[in-house]
Curated annotation (Swiss-Prot):
Alphabetical list of InterPro entries matching this protein: Cyt_b/b6_C (IPR005798), Cyt_b/b6_C_sf (IPR036150), Cyt_b/b6_N (IPR005797), Cytb/b6-like_sf (IPR027387), Cytochrome_b (IPR030689), Cytochrome_b_C_euk/bac (IPR048260), Cytochrome_b_N_euk/bac (IPR048259), Di-haem_cyt_TM (IPR016174)
Entry's Gene Ontology cellular component terms: mitochondrial inner membrane; respiratory chain complex III
Name this protein carries in UniProt: Cytochrome b
Organism: Echymipera kalubu
Highest classification ranks of the organism: Eukaryota, Metazoa, Chordata, Craniata, Vertebrata
The gene coding this protein: MT-CYB
Binding site for a ubiquinone: 201
Length: 381
């Protein structure tokens, strides 16, 4: 009798995606982040669902409903801390996943890469509307500042902002619709993840060498299920340590004060995972220019496949490109640091320099390094 998991219409899909999937034999721990992101999404949807059972999306009661969750709901404090820090884990895994894609040339799977970039943007949008929901000071002013950026769009800007606000300022209508968006977006993300996997399984996984792995494949289960389980265990450990011991380490103290439209916080800044983009936004003294640079900082990922000049796929055997990759990584750390600093000397000089370096490395230096490395491969005798 044939095995049920290979014949049953539903189980066959699961089997082909997670059990009998042929995987390259040499993929490293950098390939763990896809499954970790899937787990993060499940954790966020589940904790978010339980939070939504007790949360009220009204300006008068939103802040106190979050306090009520933490004080009066059974394990509400834990659910809230897991959800807030789960977002940080989500973005940590996302950045490492994208970094892996750039380092090993996975972006040459163009469909998978493009849907991945759209996923990144959607997750960022979800995190932004979610941050507004507790209705603290930084929630309110973050929403005001970021939505206001749309007013830089010529002609329709102001109308667009007021349409998104549902009035003439960030108020009750804004909070209600942001809650609706925050609830629906994770399910849209889940659908997009399935499409992401669908495209990936059309080609099969890339591997560290960047060579075609078809000659040496192993089944996903048990080899990579156990490997992913180790990664999962480590991520859950870090998440629990964060949620149990230092739940507010990555948050902003201003968000412990209820939203007050009459009192602006001294430093308006987003959560750590948006700081690099915020630094790029602030480094341009023109409003529209800043908004375009902010968009470009993420959308530049879409043109990376077009800028691939090397004969080799991976950076594994390309020392010049490797150096540039780690320079780019350091540059992103600098941008993250600058995004969290006040607008004063010397930070206002470092910001534009780091922003220029970011675009210069991706758009010019990396493609140039690929050409130089191609030339170095040619026999000279």
């Amino acid at each position: 009798m044939t095995n049920l998991r290979k014949t049953h219409p539903l189980m066959k899909i699961v089997n082909d995606a997670f059990i009998d999937l042929p995987a390259p034999s040499n993929i490293s721990a950098w390939w763990n982040f896809g499954s970790l992101l899937g787990i993060c999404l499940v954790i966020q949807i589940l904790t978010g669902l339980f939070l939504a059972m007790h949360y009220t999306s009204d300006t008068l009661t939103a802040f106190s409903s979050v306090a009520h969750i933490c004080r009066d709901v059974n394990y509400g404090w834990l659910i809230r801390n897991l959800h807030a820090n789960g977002a940080s884990m989500f973005f940590m895994c996302l950045f490492l996943h994208v970094g892996r894609g750039i380092y090993y040339g996975s972006y040459l799977f163009k469909e998978t890469w493009n849907i991945g970039v759209i996923l990144l943007l959607t997750v960022m949008a979800t995190a932004f509307v979610g941050y507004v929901l507790p209705w603290g000071q930084m929630s309110f002013w973050g929403a005001t500042v970021i939505t206001n950026l749309l007013s830089a769009i010529p002609y329709i800007g102001t109308t667009l902002v007021e349409w998104i606000w549902g009035g003439f300022s960030v108020d009750k209508a804004t909070l209600t619709r942001f809650f609706a968006f925050h609830f629906i977006l994770p399910f849209i993300i889940t659908a997009m993840v399935i499409v992401h996997l669908l495209f990936l399984h059309e080609t099969g996984s890339n591997n560290p060498s960047g060579l075609n792995p078809d000659s040496d494949k192993i089944p996903f289960h048990p080899y990579y299920t156990i490997k992913d389980a180790l990664g999962l265990l480590m991520m859950i450990l870090i998440l629990l340590l964060l949620a149990m011991f230092t739940p507010d380490m990555l948050g902003d103290p201003d968000n412990f004060s209820p939203a007050n439209p009459l009192n602006t916080p001294p430093h308006i800044k987003p959560e750590w995972y948006f700081l690099f983009a915020y630094a790029i936004l602030r480094s341009i003294p023109n409003k529209l220019g800043g908004v375009l640079a902010l968009l470009a900082s993420i959308l530049v990922l879409l043109i990376i496949p077009l800028l691939h000049t090397s004969k080799q796929r991976s950076l594994m055997f390309r020392p010049i490109s490797q150096t540039l990759f780690w320079l780019l990584t350091a540059d992103l750390f600098i941008l993250t640091w600058i995004g969290g600093q006040p607008v004063e000397q010397p930070f206002i000089i470092i910001g534009p320099v780091a922003s220029i370096m970011y675009f210069l490395i991706i758009l010019a230096l990396m493609p140039l390094a690929g050409l130089i490395e191609n030339y170095m491969l040619k026999p000279k005798w």
